[in-house]
């Protein structure tokens, strides 16, 4: 599945370079027109990130997301500093279909385990952002400001017994760079964890990247910058993914 992504600050579409808030690009794009176009073209899911909420929970863009969700019929998954059940309930009550949990899955594993039981594996997506160090897939947290000694494999193995199903995996070195995805990484983790539905994120810049990612076995690809900068059209991306 092709999943277009929009990162939002104060209701505006932005892209961070390698997760850096001080190195960002603002896009003069009408989000509502874009969503309407995507709905007509057959997009099945949208990925939204609340960058304000990720920095400070008091700055959540609740009105923005309420407006978006009431406007479009495309199912929404959302992330950005989700740290408690109040956040999850608030987003689900707005109409969000899936919530993306990042740092909490590392810092508060017991709590996230409980969420998987309460809400079910089809609602919770774990976002595992990794840095490759000495062939280890080390997880970074808190907007990639802090690296851990915990590997992606350890986290998936920890949550799998209670039904973990969805993982969004980003190679930080690729995010927002248009330098091509890390196909070796995705091929490896898909082979290791056949029960997980992986979403790949980072580095896609051309249609060839989508074809190569599909061959790795990932179920979905999140695309941000390359669609925002018209490297290819949504029609081309959807056709490309379906054609293989």
From Swiss-Prot:
Primary location class: cytoplasm
Molecular function (Gene Ontology), one example: 1-(5-phosphoribosyl)-5-[(5-phosphoribosylamino)methylideneamino]imidazole-4-carboxamide isomerase activity
GO biological process, one term: L-tryptophan biosynthetic process
Phylogenetic classification of the source organism: Bacteria, Pseudomonadati, Pseudomonadota, Gammaproteobacteria, Enterobacterales
Organism listed in the record: Buchnera aphidicola subsp. Schizaphis graminum (strain Sg)
Keyword hit for rRNA processing: no
Keyword flag Transmembrane: no
CC annotations in GO: cytoplasm
EC number(s) per entry: 5.3.1.16
Keywords (A to Z) from UniProt: Amino-acid biosynthesis, Cytoplasm, Histidine biosynthesis, Isomerase
Pathway(s): Amino-acid biosynthesis; L-histidine biosynthesis; L-histidine from 5-phospho-alpha-D-ribose 1-diphosphate: step 4/9
Domain of life: Bacteria
Short name of one Pfam family: His_biosynth
Family, similarity comment: Belongs to the HisA/HisF family.
Catalysed reaction equations from the record: 1-(5-phospho-beta-D-ribosyl)-5-[(5-phospho-beta-D-ribosylamino)methylideneamino]imidazole-4-carboxamide = 5-[(5-phospho-1-deoxy-D-ribulos-1-ylimino)methylamino]-1-(5-phospho-beta-D-ribosyl)imidazole-4-carboxamide
Residues forming the catalytic site: 7 (proton acceptor), 129 (proton donor)
Protein's gene: hisA
Designated name of the protein: 1-(5-phosphoribosyl)-5-[(5-phosphoribosylamino)methylideneamino] imidazole-4-carboxamide isomerase
Enzyme class: isomerase
Subcellular location: Cytoplasm
């Amino acid at each position: 599945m092709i999943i277009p992504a929009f990162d939002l600050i104060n209701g505006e579409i932005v892209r961070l370079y390698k997760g850096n808030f001080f190195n960002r690009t603002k896009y003069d794009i009408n989000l509502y027109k874009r969503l309407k176009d995507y709905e007509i073209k057959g997009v099945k899911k949208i990925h939204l990130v609340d960058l304000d909420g990720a920095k400070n929970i008091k700055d959540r863009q609740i009105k923005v997301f309420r407006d978006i969700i009431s406007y479009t019929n495309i199912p929404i998954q959302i992330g950005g500093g989700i740290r408690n059940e109040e956040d999850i309930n608030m987003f689900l009550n707005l109409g969000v279909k899936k919530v993306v949990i990042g740092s909490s899955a590392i810092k508060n594993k017991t709590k996230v385990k409980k969420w998987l039981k309460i809400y079910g594996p089809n609602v919770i997506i774990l976002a595992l952002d990794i840095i490759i160090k000495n062939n280890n897939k080390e997880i970074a947290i808190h907007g990639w400001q802090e690296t851990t000694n915990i590997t992606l494999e350890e986290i998936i193995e920890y949550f799998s017994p209670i039904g973990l199903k969805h993982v969004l995996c980003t190679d930080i070195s690729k995010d927002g760079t248009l330098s091509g995805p890390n196909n070796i990484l995705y091929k490896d983790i898909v082979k290791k964890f056949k029960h997980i539905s992986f979403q790949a994120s980072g580095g896609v810049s051309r249609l060839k990247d989508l074809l190569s990612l599909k061959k790795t076995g990932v179920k979905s690809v999140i695309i941000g910058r390359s669609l925002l900068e018209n490297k290819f059209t949504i029609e081309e991306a959807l056709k490309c993914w379906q054609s293989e």
